[in-house]
Amino acid sequence: MERRRSERVKVNLKAERISGDERYAVFIENISEHGIHLITASSHAHKKYSPGKELELKLQLPTGEKINLLCKTQWAYSRIPPEKVTDSIGLEIIDPPLQYIKFVRALHQSS
């Protein structure tokens, strides 16, 4: 049974995970209107990204424009590609802003 509310689109976008005064670079691999799959350098993901934990993401669009997103971690695990270890995290977007939804819908139309 499919649990996602909307279809995902593969992307290659930069973002920042914001935690208080600290910022962490992350890369977004795919998105939907209500979710994001991101990867980041391995750094104890299960502590920073434990399921249910809320976090803020600042997503940079290809135009250079930035969108702030409040998200909730759904899952996190480490993966080991041939070159390096990364953390893979699934996020649910809490109340996605209209600007973000329009961006995702435009991606669907162009793919």
Where would I find each of the regions flagged by the language model?
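Extended Gly/Ser/Thr-rich low-complexity repeat segments
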Residues: 47-59, 101-111
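Short conserved beta-strand and strand-loop elements enriched in small hydrophobics
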Residues: 13-18, 50-66
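N-terminal helix initiation/capping motif
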Residues: 1-44, 105-111
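C-terminal output/interaction extensions
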Residues: 81-111
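Short beta-strands and strand-coil junctions in structured, solvent-facing domains, enriched
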Residues: 44-46, 79
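Short beta-strand-centered aromatic/proline hotspots
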Residues: 25-28, 69-76
